[in-house]
């Protein structure tokens, strides 16, 4: 009996170690280009290794090459990260991948908050190398036929865009984007909605409009739909409360907060 228990524990250990090794493995990527879309908003294009894949809506740890230490004591508006206890800037952040593997490149949509990491990221030139590891996703669907209702605020659209591109035409999808000036994927999503009968895409200027869109979906689908929320933490929290107050079960709500966006 003891031998069996030890064997089972050994198998569990090997599986756990394998998962950690797989998720934590690092790959070196090259910068293709960096677009300054407006003011502090940037779209970063990275090369995609042929053997690299990920789930739509995934995030990953992006590590920059060794750089000079910053003297500014500021925080990162997207990740919320600050200096470590020794006063040094961390050179890695968790960022959402705004593209799918079949697009042939890795897209990162982010604000330049003024932190050393974000300023360095925004100033990267073509050919510069970064490291990516720990690919993961908190947005997933259990049923391949259920309706998907999405809310994204600000750069939270980065998490929702690849999901829409993967699933458009395969199920009914409703997307409300509280864009706050982040319109980089707007034309693309409008075009998808125009040619896809079961895709509704709305851009909203305030939270009340987004609530109205979601309320219409709640009245129609109730708990027969899955609700994805992504973006500014305060917005995500408010929308999560709004869904629950209107009878949506917590198990049907999945979220991805961009910590630090205020």
Where in the sequence are the language-model features?
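Ferredoxin-reductase
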Residues: 14-126, 179
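FNR/FR-type flavoprotein reductase catalytic core
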Residues: 2-24, 113-262
């Amino acid at each position: 009996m003891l031998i069996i228990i030890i064997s089972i524990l050994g198998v569990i250990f090997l599986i756990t170690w394998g998962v950690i090794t797989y998720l934590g493995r690092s790959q070196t990527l090259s910068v293709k280009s960096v677009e300054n879309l407006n003011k502090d908003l940037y779209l970063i294009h990275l090369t995609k290794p042929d053997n690299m894949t990920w789930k739509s809506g995934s995030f990953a740890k992006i590590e920059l090459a060794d750089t000079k230490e910053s003297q500014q004591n500021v925080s990162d508006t997207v990740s919320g990260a600050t200096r470590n206890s020794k006063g040094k800037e961390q050179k890695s952040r968790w960022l959402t991948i705004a593209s799918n593997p079949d697009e042939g490149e890795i897209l990162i949509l982010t604000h330049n908050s003024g932190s050393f990491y974000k300023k360095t990221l925004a100033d990267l030139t073509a050919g510069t190398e970064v490291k990516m590891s720990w690919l993961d996703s908190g947005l997933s669907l259990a049923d391949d036929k259920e309706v998907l209702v999405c809310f994204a605020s600000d750069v939270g659209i980065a998490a929702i865009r690849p999901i829409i591109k993967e699933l458009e035409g395969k199920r009914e999808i409703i997307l409300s984007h509280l864009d706050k000036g982040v319109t980089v994927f707007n034309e693309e999503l409008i075009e998808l909605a125009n040619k896809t009968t079961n895709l509704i895409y709305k851009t909203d200027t305030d939270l009340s409009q987004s609530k109205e869109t979601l309320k219409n979906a709640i009245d129609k689908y109730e708990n027969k739909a899955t609700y994805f929320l992504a973006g500014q933490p305060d917005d995500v929290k408010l929308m999560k409360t709004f869904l629950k107050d209107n009878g949506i079960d917590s198990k049907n709500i999945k979220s991805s907060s961009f910590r630090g966006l205020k």
